[in-house]
Amino acid sequence: RHDRAMKVVVIDDDPTGSQTVHGCPLLLRWDVETLRRALRHPSPLLFLLADTRSLAPAAAAERNRDIAGNLAGALGAEALQRADVLLVSRGDSTLRGHGVLEPDTLQDAFGPFDATFHVPAFLEGGRTTVNGVHLLHGQPVHTTPFAKDRLFGFSSSDLAAWLQEKSRGAIRRADVQRISGRELDAAGGAGLPRLMDRLRALRGNVPVVVDAERQQQLCAFGAAVRA
């Protein structure tokens, strides 16, 4: 038996993500039968610990393809549609990891998607996004030691520029849309239908960066996505 509400399936690149949730299945393997059982769980949330941050790019992409293929098989076996699932590719809130490769792989293997939302945020740890710029305790994250990571270093805190850098130009900075903090504040009240209309108009896997300064903004964004 299924709860036919949308299931949020989180593909987690590192064990730290699952430490912030409770009351949902946490899978360490993703064969079709295991996924079928997890889809029947009443929780609206399902975590898969893919641990891809520790892998080379080719191996990380292959693991995402494997998960996407098995998830599609499990959905079919349970008479569910891909539209019944909201995929979250959970990465590092200081922009380390395969933050462009993994969503792109999921688009190819599980899409097509109307949009990919990039929402780096860990508010309790001082990691916010304001005016499209990712900050650590108010400091642009590209000026912190995280940006000098040996494997995942980067040169810009502006998320549109970061997407262009990490995609090696496949995503153009000018093509990246942004959902502003002001829109999200409005969506926390009477402005929610306006944000929902904007999201419904997205097509062609457009990249969208999302401001995140307060928990209420993230809640409003989540409500609009799931509406």
Regions inferred by a protein language model and the residue ranges of each:
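Alpha-helical scaffolding within the catalytic cores
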Residues: L28-L35
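Short, Lys/Arg-enriched N-terminal segments with co-localized hydrophobic residues
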Residues: R1-A5
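Acidic, glycine-rich loop-and-beta core segments that form the ion-binding/anion-interacting portion
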Residues: V225-A227
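Glycine-rich, phosphate-binding/catalytic loops in enzymes
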Residues: L27-L28, T105
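Cap/lid and interdomain-hinge subdomains that line or gate substrate/regulatory clefts
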Residues: M6-D12, Q19-H22, L35-R37, P44, ...
